[in-house]
Amino acid sequence: MPRSWQEMNALTLAYLGDVVYELWVRTHLLNNGYEKVNELHRLATQYVRAGTQAKLLHHILPHLDEQELSVVHRGRNAKGGHPKSTDVVTYRYATGFEALVGYWQLTGRTERMLWAFEQVDQFVGEEDEGKGKGETAKEEESITDALSPAEQSEIDC
């Protein structure tokens, strides 16, 4: 018998959410006419980086229901890996987003998930604005730079 999502560790939800989001990103790019592998990789990296995921989460937060917010909190507060190219706060928001995606996948809320994913284009590449082709930001902007204190407390536990 399959386990309920409620019994799963938040990092397990994030693990699933990571692959679901990555698959959507790759499919999205292919459906939009990108075919060169180097370009696909460069663009996919912009979509899946922690800063982009954290900004997308911040954008959809006001539209999440109580259960979804609870999943985000669990993911954000889970103790897990260490960020590679971003700060801890941004990394945790991204983990919260991935946990939410895992929750949506396990509960069959595909329409909700796709609604969120379809809003990501506006956040892709923000960290790289002003840089030449092929250059990427060494460190991402912290999501806390974009949040007001009230917004930070809304997602804090």
From Swiss-Prot:
One of its GO terms (molecular function) is ribonuclease III activity. GO terms for biological process: rRNA processing. InterPro entries: Mini3_fam, RNase_III_dom, RNase_III_sf. SUPFAM superfamilies: RNase III domain-like. It is an enzyme of class 3 (hydrolase). Residues 126-157 are annotated as: Disordered. SMART domains: RIBOc. It is found in: Cytoplasm. Its cofactor is Mg(2+). Keywords: Cytoplasm, Endonuclease, Hydrolase, Magnesium, Nuclease, Ribosome biogenesis, RNA-binding, rRNA processing, rRNA-binding. The active site is at D18. Residues 130-141 have a biased composition (Basic and acidic residues). GO terms for cellular component: cytoplasm. It comes from the Bacteria. Belongs to the MrnC RNase family. Involved in correct processing of both the 5' and 3' ends of 23S rRNA precursor. Processes 30S rRNA precursor transcript even in absence of ribonuclease 3 (Rnc); Rnc processes 30S rRNA into smaller rRNA precursors. PANTHER family: MINI-RIBONUCLEASE 3. This is Mini-ribonuclease 3. It comes from Desulfitobacterium hafniense (strain Y51). The lineage of its organism: Bacteria, Bacillati, Bacillota, Clostridia, Eubacteriales.
